[in-house]
Amino acid sequence: MLRGKPLVVTMLCASAFLVIGCGRSGSDTRSTQSGEKSGDKGVLNLYIWTDYMAPDTIASFEKMTGIKVRVSYFDTNETLEARVLTGNSGFDVVLPTAPFFQRQIRSGAYLPLDKTKLPNLVNLDPAIMARVALNDPGNAHGVVYAWGTYGIGYNAKMVADALPNAPLNSWRLIFDPANAARLAKCGINFLDAPAGVVRLVLKYLGKNPNAATPQDLADVEAVLSKIRPYVRTIDSSIDIQAMANGDICVALGYNGSFVQARSRAKEAKNGIDIGYTIPDEGSLLWFDMLAIPRDAPNAANAHLFINYLMTPQVIANISNFIGFADAKSAASSLLDASIAADPIVYPPRDQQQRLFVQSEDSPEQSRAITRLWQKFKTAQ
């Protein structure tokens, strides 16, 4: 995933994109056969990325249902995974990213959805749901909330000043130490997403991003260690505002974050021009899911909330706000035209062909990536 203005777009050319492969409280009781809990029936506990719903999304649900939504935030998929795999999280709805979602399903972390309580599933694009069914057979445990890409967001003027003739269409922009050293003067931020970023470095090195050997990971570590002195921050929650304010000039992040940053800069009338690129070497495609933890205190309310989010007007408002594509048909008339036609949100066909989906890591590989990432984060 991702974070806070209206959730963006539906899927323009969605089917074609997917064919080619183109990122708290409440009492806890045991599940009944129906999957419902005996928690506070007037409450829903939501665990989500920051900046990942429209300003009125939750308030409108509360007004419509009388259910109070308690929101908590996570900043990495690893943090979410630790909570749901440990159990007794107290959450009713969470937003995992595939392929973390696949591993969590296998571990028994989620309730099967009661689709009789989700009539708005008919509004979703079958091609998108078929794509994520590779991780969740029959879409039994989750609903697509948003999808998008990893890439590089940049402040056009600041980058041009710091690095004339910058290779904007290549990962060399941030993974080459000579370039990173020049850009350090205006600020580089990296997404705190170990498995994703490691795969992007592998792609940059011309290696298979989903079949890394121990030597491949050593090569990734070498790349990251050389650029670490020039990376100002490694934080998934700051890039939107930092880019909009001109506090940083380059960020490795999610596409929708830069749509939001661009919008905020425009609202502020500060003259900041924010661009986004999917590097020529290729990049990651991600899906964020709505799911219900197996021990959710308020599973009935969770179904109500997920169904509400799949209402066409609700999800369109979210998409228009957060700058990410949703699981509806891109032809939806409810989307802002600027979103539906935005190449940052819906990549052109030539860019679609360069996108790949992250496979699930073995426990051994996951531990190796975590160790590598911790070295990167703690080194200066």
Regions found by a protein language model. Give the residues of each.
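Hinge/lid segment of periplasmic solute-binding proteins
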Residues: 38, 102-149, 166-175
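Short beta-strand->loop
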Residues: 111-122, 172, 268-284, 293-296
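Mature extracytoplasmic/periplasmic domains
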Residues: 293-354
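A bilobed periplasmic-binding-protein/Venus flytrap-type ligand-binding module shared by bacterial periplasmic
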Residues: 153-158, 203-206, 286-298, 317
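Early extracytoplasmic/lumenal segment of secretory-pathway proteins
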Residues: 22-25, 30-107, 241
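Conserved C-terminal helix/tail region of periplasmic/extracytoplasmic solute-binding proteins
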Residues: 349-380
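Ligand-binding "clamshell"
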Residues: 105-113, 131-132, 137-139, 230, ...
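Ligand-binding pocket segment of bilobal, Venus flytrap-like solute-binding proteins
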Residues: 189-201, 205-277
